[in-house]
From Swiss-Prot:
Keyword ATP-binding: yes
Top-level taxon: Bacteria
Transmembrane stretches, start-end: none
Gene Ontology process terms (BP): L-histidine biosynthetic process
Record's protein name: Phosphoribosyl-ATP pyrophosphatase
E.C. number: 3.6.1.31
Keyword entries, A-Z: Amino-acid biosynthesis, ATP-binding, Cytoplasm, Histidine biosynthesis, Hydrolase, Nucleotide-binding
SUPFAM superfamilies in alphabetical order: all-alpha NTP pyrophosphatases
Organism per entry: Sinorhizobium fredii (strain NBRC 101917 / NGR234)
Reactions the enzyme catalyzes: 1-(5-phospho-beta-D-ribosyl)-ATP + H2O = 1-(5-phospho-beta-D-ribosyl)-5'-AMP + diphosphate + H(+)
Example of a GO cellular component annotation carried by this entry: cytoplasm
Class of enzymatic activity (EC top level): hydrolase
Amino acid sequence: MTELTLSDLEQIVATRAGAAPEDSWTAKLVAAGQPKAAKKLGEEAVETVIAAVSGDRKNLIDESADLLYHLMVVLNIAAVPLQDVMSELARRTSQSGLQEKANRQNP
């Protein structure tokens, strides 16, 4: 099986975003704008939570894939590169989660 990275997914979304909306779900979602894309991301997040709580492993995998895809679409529309998100994660993981949270609450 070929391994797909989040960077690969980011590139796929960017490519498909440039297609005609009648030919691509991604292009249609991008053309609809950030409110529509963000709403869809929220729906997928809720579906992922429900799958996790219900203990449905297969559905959790499926919904997680949908969630990651829709996050990439939202980031694409906002012109936020995945690398910016990964850099923030790297910064946060350089310290304990509790310390990182305390730093955010008491800047």
